[in-house]
């Protein structure tokens, strides 16, 4: 083996080397990471919580009180501390995915549980029995919390929850309450970065698709830079259209009716796009094309939703259907479409009401069976588009930093309000946890030392959560 080859071999072996720690040494190093990260996150807790400024790779810093945002921004140079931090980040992220808020409290509880558990292990207690005492008694606390919940449904209750969740901002409280009033408690409310000084609430009735026209040549109103048609046909497919021959047969039938056509496809390009634009400019065909929204299964589901809402048929090669064989009966219809460079709004779809109701019920069943926040948001969005409308809160501010800070605040308040509508509210400030943990005291009887310790760890963490809000 040459000297160079030996050096390469040594470098590879060194790169794969692992630093091993065991027992209390490993736990103590992890605890440092848990403590440091939790200190930063918990500083944002409650109405008196502090803002945290986060340096970004580019642009101005981000100012936020959102626990999971702070947690995810932290990375330590020490890899052991970083491992400990990752434990807490995972908890915060999971809490955010499931509940949408409460990440700071989750971080606080995680720190206390880990800290107290290390004390138990250092005392020589059996970790499996301690864990058993903790996990079994958590169920009892959850049941007690469920008993003390109060349902939230009226506009005033929604306003109060939103205001409290937004650090007492009645302006944000009214904004969120108005949004729920506009689209209903199951409707979709999205928060976007605005371009004005003040916050704005826009309600879109009908079905809004987050895709604009493929080419600006499809505009028919140069002032508003939009394309608007009344009583159009709608072609719905997940097929990429790159040849005019694919759509020539159906276009011939559409031209004879004199009605406009909205094409929703995976993409429209090549001579197909060029021919559509030429015919539109010449006035021989009223047409506009947009790309299908979403990706993967979500794209297919959304296209099927559009088909149901407009009384059309979803044309897909997976279903054995080809564009060349599309008939006029396969096309959807609606009263009006408005297409901008960013989105498309379908008003007055001609879908069968019973079919739309059945589709909505199916989505509701899927909602009850998912725990993923991403899937929940997508299902809610689909449901709202089928049943009513979408409310968009555009966040305003004097500059990018202020807009970002306000957006985080509104996001948290919206998520907390939505959770309150779904599952109710309990006494705040850690009081509900403290009261619920009282149910654990009788359960400590006739238990071994390890299980009793596990129960006490849960109780102590709840007491700390309550005191931290003071």
Swiss-Prot record:
Its main location: other. GO terms for molecular function: ATP binding; ATP-dependent protein folding chaperone. It is found in: Hydrogenosome. GO terms for biological process: protein refolding. The keyword ATP-binding applies. It comes from the Eukaryota. InterPro entries: Chaperonin_Cpn60_CS, Cpn60/GroEL, Cpn60/GroEL/TCP-1, GroEL-like_apical_dom_sf, GROEL-like_equatorial_sf, TCP-1-like_intermed_sf. Belongs to the chaperonin (HSP60) family. Implicated in hydrogenosomal protein import and macromolecular assembly. May facilitate the correct folding of imported proteins. May also prevent misfolding and promote the refolding and proper assembly of unfolded polypeptides generated under stress conditions in the hydrogenosome (Potential). This is Hydrogenosomal chaperonin HSP60.
